[in-house]
């Protein structure tokens, strides 16, 4: 299979980001006026799938949405980006949302996330696209769904002969055997420390952490 024929499958959440720019932290019981605000698409999986599509890759997003107005908002975005999204609609839960409070001066932020319907992503969502997956295709997931689901989809994708990429964010505890199903892992410094329990204070620590991650079964 040539590089051009590889298809990227991204498994994970979509959330609507509701961002508020403020000049101070909100105290309990206090109401303040934001300096500005905006609404935008979020969720690591959706953002990664959109980025891959913009770069010209044939891409499928596997996610869940609620039966609400944000459902239409998500589909409008994916349609505009020419991204195919395999979505299951949950009639009893909302589409994922994130409230982001950003300090207008420092840029520091606080985030509250409700994954909504996406919290119930399962292996069944993976199976809905399994017939389209081929050996050599790329499978990318994160840690925004449950650890059991993350383990199961990585295992299934690897057994199909797919190139599996795991972005372990936000960090969570997962069975160590899951790392054997990751061809590539992309932790940042904090996540690498959490996976290995090695404080990264210098080059030698980084090398030790890399070796420990490889010992878990990760190839790259």
Regions picked out by a protein language model, each given a short descriptive name:
Residues 53, 79, 158-159, 214:
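Anion (oxyanion) recognition and catalysis
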């Amino acid at each position: 299979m040539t590089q051009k024929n590889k298809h990227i499958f991204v498994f994970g959440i979509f959330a609507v980001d509701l961002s508020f720019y403020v000049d101070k932290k909100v105290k309990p019981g206090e109401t303040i006026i934001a300096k500005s605000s905006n609404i935008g698409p979020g969720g690591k999986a959706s953002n990664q799938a959109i980025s891959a599509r913009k770069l010209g890759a044939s891409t499928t997003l596997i996610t869940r949405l609620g039966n609400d107005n944000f459902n239409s908002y998500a589909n409008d975005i994916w349609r505009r980006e020419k991204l195919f999204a395999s979505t299951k609609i949950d009639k009893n839960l909302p589409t994922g949302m994130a409230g982001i409070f950003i300090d207008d001066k420092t840029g520091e932020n606080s985030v509250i996330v409700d994954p909504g319907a996406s919290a119930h992503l399962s292996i069944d969502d993976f199976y809905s696209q399994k017939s389209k997956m081929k050996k050599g295709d790329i499978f990318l997931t994160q840690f925004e769904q449950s650890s059991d689901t993350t383990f199961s989809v990585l295992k299934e994708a690897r057994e199909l002969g797919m190139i599996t990429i795991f972005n372990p964010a936000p960090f969570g505890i997962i069975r160590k055997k899951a790392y054997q199903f990751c061809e590539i892992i992309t932790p940042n410094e904090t996540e690498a420390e959490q996976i290995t329990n090695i404080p990264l204070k210098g080059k030698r620590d980084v090398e030790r952490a890399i070796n420990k991650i490889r010992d878990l079964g990760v190839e790259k």
